[in-house]
Amino acid sequence: NTNTTTNAVNRDYAVPTYMALESSDGFSSASVGYAGSASDGLAMLDSAHSLANGYSSAPDGHVTLTAEVPTGWNRSVTLALGFGTTEAAALTVAHRSVSQQFDAAWSRYEQQWQRYDAGLRKPARWLGSAATREYYESVNVVKASEDKTFPGAIAAGLASPWGQSVPAGNFTNGEPTYFGSYREEFSRDTYEAFTGLLVAGDIQTARAATLFLFDRQQLPDGSMPRNSLPNGESAPDTGGLQLDECSYPILMDWQSGLAGDRQLYLQHVIPAADFVVAHGPSDGSERWEEQSGYSPSTIAAEIAGLTAAAAIARVQGDIAHARLYQATADDFARNIKSWTVTTSGPFAPRYFIRVSKTGDPNAAISYNLGNGSGTYDQRSVVDAGFLELVRLGVLPASDPDVQASVKVIDDTIERQTSNGPGWYRYGTTSTESVDGYGDCYQPSGTSCSVIGAPWPPTDTGTGHLWPVLSAEHGEFDIANNDSGHAGPLLTAMRNMTSGQGLEPEQVWEDANVAPSPFGTDPSTASIGFVNGQPAGSASPLTWAQASYARLALDLSAGRNLEAPDIVTDRYLTHGPPGQLPLTVTSPAPGATVTTPTVTVTGTTTPGAHVVAESVGPLGGTAGIASIKAGKSGDWTLALPTYFASTTITVTATLHRSTAYAQQYVIGGPLPGTTVLSVSDPTGDDNGPGTYQYPTSSNFTAGSFDVTHFAVSQDGTNVYIETSLRTLVSTFGAEFGAQLLDIYVHAPGAASTSTASAYPGNMNYTIASPWSQRFEAQGFASPAWVNAAGGSVGNAQFVTDSPSGTATLIVPESTFGTVGSGWTFTVALTGQDGTHFPPTRDFTATPGAYTFGVCAPGGTGPICSPSVDPNSVPKVMDTITPPGVSQDTELDPTLGPVVLQGVPVP
């Protein structure tokens, strides 16, 4: 059956494929069946040790093929697996393959890799044969992780972490779940792979990786998605902003020698750099994809990326952008310590922390680490991310705060194993692992309970040691003139590999754990763990293989080969740049400006070169203007404004001294003609009047309070905008707390539904039958589906914190032209990615991470113990038409809840 489906709607490269298995000696028996059922060949062998009563047909479903090869002692059999878009093609490929001499095919394959290896940089002979072998294997794994259809698309890993615990038969919205996992393209992981290829001498693949990110993955606003499919399109689990992922491709452009490419600069580098300027230094989440705030590793990437952007701009003769980018990078470098070095923490007088939530590293702010871990004061949570400031050339290894922080992490998150030392991703004052991303072990600082159980499906566990952090520490040691310490780390990484030298994501540092007995539920079964050997996440991890290759060559050269010279020249070789005074006198921060342009005025050092840029929420092409400050230091510039809000960045440059200032103004209405504009009362984010927010500090007041809803169209796109009283980053994403569903009724639509997005879970239906539905959140691409659940197309989702707006943008040609009779039904609730459906749970009274049906001691029918919290409508706020009370509409004690939409007049 070629009628296959997947919830990965952008996987256009995947077509129904036939598979044929041929044996040079035929088969004694064979059977086809359904995975996990009695007809599965594996189940038949387990029960009867034979395929004698097998099956010859298994239409539809998840199919398995099992065959018996007739072979005896000292006899070889060749098997060939053929693929094709037709049955005949698959059979032909298999037959032609099995007809070849295997030794000859193997020899050709081996020679191809030998030719590739011959072109690589050679490690020093004194590293020894074992290290040399692992070096070549590491580079080969990175190269092998590149997709063969889309050059430069390097997967984060060729493994599926804990794939044994994820059933192949899972469905999402009625379609088979696409489990891409690490076999997708993440900009940060691609960059790490790029660095390994670059120092190894494979400039061709390094350039291909750069072009893949810009040509295929980059979003219209200039940013990079968290991850993508191999074709660069959005994956089902794409979501959340990470500024290091937006910055690294710019550095890759410079380091791979593409700075002279004019079109690449105009179409890709400028939008990317403008996005980083507008959103840096602290938007989105840090490199572990868990926390928002000011991250040393993220800001290091921003500084390096913007310095590279300035260098590229100079090559292109674009002096205004060069000054803007470099001055912004200078400001980030100037303030990195004030943002992320605490002087009131428990470990030392001064040290870098993992993340500073507000830019004040001395604030007594606590946050939950996630994945079943606890809540800790930000000053007591440390990681090694600050070492990126050294690797990328922003700070010297000898910097006192760096030196003090290295001692802190070595005392706090370093652990010894039978194969050498390693480091946790992060840690606290606890002597146990507080990272919950990994196979469960107890005692630990997390809530997992079954020792050896995998991280999914509960998304809780225990994090272990990451070999990439050993390489990171080793590169610091080299920069610190301590290669004697870096060498043993290279050896430890090699000894911690799996198979023939595959570098894992995590390594087990605890006591050995035996594998669970055969037949144990895979969701809780231990695969068996040995101290100093790989844990159960991913092996290989492409980043880890690249970091091993990089460290081996760095040790060989006695210096860090990949450190970008343009950054070290700017901040180390010639000393930190000076700082100029800069004041923006108008407009006032947060002012409302509804005109197409805004006049920006201010003062700085007389004769300084002032550059100002304005960027809207859609990013893309930004407005830029420049002028030389007058004799009194005053300056005036005009910039375009945009809908929602406009971020204005101003810089001043005079010789090697710079200055930077940034603010925003609230903009005008949506583009085009507004066809629907409805206000909603403030403070009604309590469902039927009793609902309560979770008690965790992660949930900010007003985050579920819809204040306005609007729809506009301009002949090309339709804009659907939902305004919230408060829109702040939560769990590392700007729309990380919310789950927004919008049901669209179009008159005359052939197929409609009145069901909620998740019938039986959301506990409501829709009054106006809908033919299209949108669902938006911060950790996945927006869903745009029809009444049957099929994908309609790709929607762009733009959030804007200053204006508190979340806007869906879709092509009018697909969505339709909105007119009288259309109805929009809005339902806002909480997102929880730890289970499916991704709706946050309700309990009788609020919990740390659950909504409360009522406050403690609440009265009224809905607060009665007889009301099951699982039966109430999961709607914190909606927009009702005139004459409809939200309190009444959402009260489940009055009968089935039916949401009324707002009609287009």
Residue ranges and their predicted role:
Residues 2-181, 563, 568-577:
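Acidic/polar, glycine-enriched structural segments that form the non-catalytic walls/loops
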Residues 142-149, 202-224, 258, 263-285, ...:
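Long, well-ordered core segments of solenoidal/helical folds
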Residues 109, 177-282, 295-309, 313, ...:
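Aromatic-rich carbohydrate-recognition surfaces in CAZymes
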Residues 670-777, 831-835:
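Surface-exposed, glycine/proline- and aromatic-rich loop segments on solvent-exposed faces
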